[in-house]
């Protein structure tokens, strides 16, 4: 399926149409949601976190060891699998680095206004939280990345309520060109049997979510999808997870920033945030009864350089 086939939800540029497609079909690939200049500016710092593809594919064992050692790897929960066929393999989940990053530019990209605006538009609500924030890097040859079709039911402790006001939006922002031979996510099209939602993917066309850097793949947890293998020699693929839920939806979650908010990467990030950006992580907005003059003073001490004017003005 071509990335230009907008009738399938791949490569849409009109945000209203893209939001409607997500609401009706559960997924959409928004082409160029973030300008490539913004992506490229941030990706200059990506190689402080990951080996450059040229370096990685030079077959230096020390470089591969660095990649493995710096990854937040969830693959331990999956059993070993045979080399052939679609399966969840431990090494598929190498390459995760959790937010906040040591890169200020990538941290700012995590809350890019175009992404948060689209999430609000698609979800149909303004008060949202970012609950999954990480980068995922893959390189050809690390493992067989071919997965079976699956749904992401591990974002919720109760069954998903797939209705306006209740649904969450999962998303991948493309940091690199995600072409057909570097593992674009595959989506199972066709109407799902909502009476038996976990029985398997629907019969219908399969869509490859190939797209350019700056594109954003948004999907819901009921969508059947899978990872595919990287087949390009010397290939790589980098995505930024940016997933959102309604404020107050404590039953949904994935990544938690509170334990790292005393570290330098978060402090630097938070000091540059607007109230609305901090609210994506649960911080009370100006005017919330949580705030007192003393707490606003403490906010300035905790995040040197933050513009606390909105919080202070709201106390007046």
Which residue stretches match the model-derived regions?
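Active-site rim elements
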Residues: 102-108, 204-207, 227-228
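Non-heme Fe(II)-dependent double-stranded beta-helix
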Residues: 2-24, 31-149, 155
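Catalytic core of non-heme Fe(II) oxygenases with the double-stranded beta-helix
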Residues: 117, 142-210, 251-257
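Conserved metal-binding segment of the jelly-roll/cupin
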Residues: 211-225
């Amino acid at each position: 399926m071509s990335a230009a086939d907008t009738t399938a939800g791949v490569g849409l540029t009109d945000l209203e149409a893209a939001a409607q497609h997500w609401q009706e079909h559960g997924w959409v690939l928004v082409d160029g949601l973030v300008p490539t200049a913004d992506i490229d500016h941030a990706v200059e710092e990506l190689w402080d976190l990951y080996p450059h593809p040229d370096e990685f594919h030079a077959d230096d064992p020390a470089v591969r060891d660095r990649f493995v050692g710096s990854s937040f790897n969830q693959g331990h929960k999956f059993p070993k699998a045979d080399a052939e066929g679609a399966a969840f393999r431990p090494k598929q989940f190498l390459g995760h680095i959790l937010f906040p990053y040591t890169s200020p530019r990538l941290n700012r990209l995590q809350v890019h206004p175009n992404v948060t605006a689209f999430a609000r538009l698609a979800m149909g609500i303004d008060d949202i939280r970012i609950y999954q924030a990480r980068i995922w890097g893959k390189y050809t040859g690390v493992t067989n990345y071919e997965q079976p079709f699956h749904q992401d039911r591990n974002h919720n402790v109760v069954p998903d309520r797939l209705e306006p006001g209740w649904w969450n939006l999962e998303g991948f922002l493309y940091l690199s060109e995600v072409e057909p031979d570097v593992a674009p996510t595959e989506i199972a099209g066709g109407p799902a049997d909502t009476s038996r939602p976990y029985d398997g993917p629907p019969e219908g066309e399969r869509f490859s979510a190939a797209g350019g850097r700056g594109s954003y793949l948004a999907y819901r947890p009921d969508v059947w999808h899978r990872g595919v293998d990287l087949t390009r020699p010397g290939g790589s693929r980098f995505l930024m997870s940016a997933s959102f839920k309604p404020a107050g939806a404590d039953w949904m979650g994935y990544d938690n920033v509170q334990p790292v908010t005393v570290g330098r990467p978060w402090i630097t990030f938070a000091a540059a945030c607007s109230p609305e950006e901090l609210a994506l992580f649960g911080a009370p907005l100006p005017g919330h009864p949580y705030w007192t003059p003393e707490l606003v003073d403490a906010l300035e001490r905790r995040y040197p350089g933050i513009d606390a004017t909105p919080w202070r003005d709201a106390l007046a």
